[in-house]
């Protein structure tokens, strides 16, 4: 199974991806996480350092694939998760989609691409071009990371549009949304009402999730010294269990941009209407009585 994780830049995709990878490994699966970001820091919390990228390795070998060995590009991370960083072209030049393609090509050459139960692509920021939508060409499922904010949900909607487009020619489905570090989910619920899709999990506003990134550790590793964090790991295990159940998934129908802008902004600008809508059923019940 291959999974592509997308979401607004800075929303916590890499932190979430690493913890999901560990959760899948804890369920007995052989997992490979592929970072698809020029920053090459996707797997930092799994390995504890910035591993060399596929592109760096290929350049050092003058792109002679036959001179590259699995141990040159695949690094062992915490919890028996294997890690690869695709890297990216120089700033302002080249195409990120090409880099993803070269990464998959090399892993196939090394007979490594099909050795794993789960391959998880952690993809940078929003989908702004066909190049960075390239991981969707290989994925069975897409997971979108968001929070309860306007910008993150707007980005989620654009990603949903990319999933729908790719699903025309690939066996791709949207597994659902994951809310990351949010104290509320009212805006998420409002969006899902307009663009129906599963919500796999909503993680509460836990500071240790952010701190784990700085420490270069997953929550599963931190819990070894802080048992009180075990309940946080259960959120990721729940996501892993849903993925392993091979959900049917959906082909989303995104909300038009202007309509979504109006929907989400109205939620903040006219909170009274929202409150009244929530109270309507109670009023009706009272009238019936």
UniProtKB/Swiss-Prot annotation:
CDD domains: Bchl-like. Pathway: Porphyrin-containing compound metabolism; chlorophyll biosynthesis (light-independent). One of its GO terms (molecular function) is metal ion binding. Its EC number is 1.3.7.7. It catalyses: chlorophyllide a + oxidized 2[4Fe-4S]-[ferredoxin] + 2 ADP + 2 phosphate = protochlorophyllide a + reduced 2[4Fe-4S]-[ferredoxin] + 2 ATP + 2 H2O. Coiled coil: none annotated. Mg(2+) binds at residue 14. One of its GO terms (cellular component) is chloroplast. SUPFAM superfamilies: P-loop containing nucleoside triphosphate hydrolases. One of its GO terms (biological process) is photosynthesis, dark reaction. Binds 1 [4Fe-4S] cluster per dimer. Keywords: 4Fe-4S, ATP-binding, Chlorophyll biosynthesis, Chloroplast, Iron, Iron-sulfur, Magnesium, Metal-binding, Nucleotide-binding, Oxidoreductase, Photosynthesis, Plastid. The keyword Metal-binding applies. Its cofactor is [4Fe-4S] cluster. NCBIfam families: DPOR_bchL. This is Light-independent protochlorophyllide reductase iron-sulfur ATP-binding protein. It comes from Marchantia polymorpha (Common liverwort).
